[in-house]
Regions:
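Short alpha-helical segments and helix-capping/turn motifs at coil-helix boundaries
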Residues: 28-29, 60-62, 119-126, 168
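Membrane-protein biogenesis/insertion across secretory and organellar systems
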Residues: 64, 77-92, 97-98, 103-104, ...
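Extended, Lys/Arg-enriched charged tracts that mediate electrostatic binding to polyanionic substrates
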Residues: 104-146
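GHKL/Bergerat-fold ATPase module
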Residues: 73, 86-98, 134-210
Length: 210
């Protein structure tokens, strides 16, 4: 945790009363009301620990937003020291669109920008599965074999997303190890965001998807 305290203030549309949720992560939480006039919506304030002040660096914040939340539907704006806002994420996820609406050029650009490739993929596989478990996968087979393809310790290169939020790029078991030359993403709405990486790794949902 980077914050020693979190304060969430929320005001419902059509009302003037705000509710405040506070927690230090150690002694539960406290909810109180506030009659102070506030704008409709929710604000979240993090009171950073002294050893986490580097998270106030704008470049670091933008990098973190780009890594973990680049593809969520809501734009994330970061204000600089001059109070000027700049959108830090693309707020788009190519894989959520129907494959019929995506051009080969768009697939190639995504492949290059996401996986650092220099040429177009040899083959792409784009599927959406709906049912008791919902997930989308966008997989690429590169034209050029990775230089470390035959290294036993090479990890698979399929990144896991939950509701468009990046979780990890080295979750074991998503695809067999002999397919470690395959690169791509797996996005599911059937896993919870508030679980640890270890629980995701051992999730029966992930095993069924695999």
């Amino acid at each position: 945790m980077v914050a020693e305290k979190v304060v969430v203030t929320s005001t419902k549309a059509g009302t003037s009363e705000a509710f405040i949720w506070e927690s230090d992560g150690q002694n539960g939480f406290n909810i109180s009301g506030s009659e102070q006039s506030r704008n409709v919506g929710t604000s979240i304030k993090l009171f950073l620990r002294k050893d986490a002040k580097d998270y106030l660096d704008l470049a670091k914040l933008k990098t973190l937003v780009k890594k973990y939340s680049d593809h969520i539907t809501v734009p994330i704006n970061i204000k600089d020291n001059k109070n000027e806002a700049e959108q830090a994420n693309s707020a788009e996820a190519l894989w959520t669109r129907p494959s019929s609406s995506i051009t080969n050029e768009e697939y190639t650009e995504f492949f290059k920008s996401t996986f650092g490739a220099f040429d177009e993929p040899y083959l792409k596989i784009h599927n959406k599965t709906e049912g008791s478990i919902d997930f989308t996968n966008l997989l690429f087979i590169p034209k050029t074999a990775p230089f470390d393809l035959f290294e036993p310790e090479r990890k698979t290169r399929v990144s896991l997303y939950i509701n468009r939020v990046f979780i990890s790029k080295d979750i074991d078991g998503i695809i067999p190890t002999w397919l470690r030359f395959v690169q791509g993403i797996l996005d599911t709405t059937s896993l919870d965001l508030n679980v640890s990486r270890e629980l995701v790794q051992n999730s029966p949902v992930l095993r069924k998807i695999s």
